[in-house]
């Protein structure tokens, strides 16, 4: 067999392997064919397609660039390169690819359709809509155009319009990948959990093994309180991918909700063995260790979480509260001051910071942040309660009574608030009695 025949034979075998889903073998055969004959642009293009199917955008881009060195203006290759560059976040370079296509052939619709998602990634939603309407002038009803503009609308919070666009995609292409899952996400974001559930079920009927859909559906079921069904979805993920950290983490969350503490701890420790920097796992483990009064170990995990989570405000809030529970007041104070700098309009952040100041006996600083919390959220009975306690400690009974009265109006059934209100009422009565007695004593002396 001569070199030309062997290279063609390997390329044909690669095509068959690609059709069979044996992607790594297909890539190897194409690379062997290219090594024999490095001047065939189609083989580089096909190699790019194989790498795309393997979710390897970096190597796909390399293959497409090689193809373009041989055939510089090929529209399909430029289009695929633009798509991968968008996935990698190189949006300006992606736009250059699409614009090069449009200059050579203004009727090539994918160059407009794919620019919808590129502009969406850049946050330029006006241009995304321009591309949508330009694409529709060429192809009146393209399911991918509706899908892409739906993503833009979803990002902007225009959920109803996003759903309508995705339903158009569904009408035009009932088997469009993950279309039911996207509609489910929008309904979930709208708070319509039952409709979201129905669309996740529809997506799994189309693709029963979709790990992404199984994970999302499992979390939705957890939110619905359908814990047994939720756990079944996460276990289906683990059947395919035994080391899926997210599935183990969610099973730990389920166990925690059901007070199966040993199982929860086992799952969170397993998550950290698989992925040592998995977001949230150290915090959950710290929470469990606090329940078991193992404060030193809990603190170690909570501080590890801070190193992983960076400026994630939700995690700073959670870890700050847990450090307060662990009585690691100075650590908590540092975390919560950082949170307040990042989220100055967050009433809960100011309140938690106030609590840490109170625990450090910095009463005036605590009062300052409690008042800021109430300014941001007027109906905040817990902050009013703590403010009343702080003024009671300072001996400012009138202010303490005023704040506890407001708290009692907001939460009349709260036992702590009612008890403090009773105490302050009694204290106020005795204070007045002492004042009257002293006044009467002075009066009697004057009459003598």
Provide a role label for each language-model segment.
Residues 19, 53, 87-88, 121, ...:
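Register position in tetratricopeptide repeats
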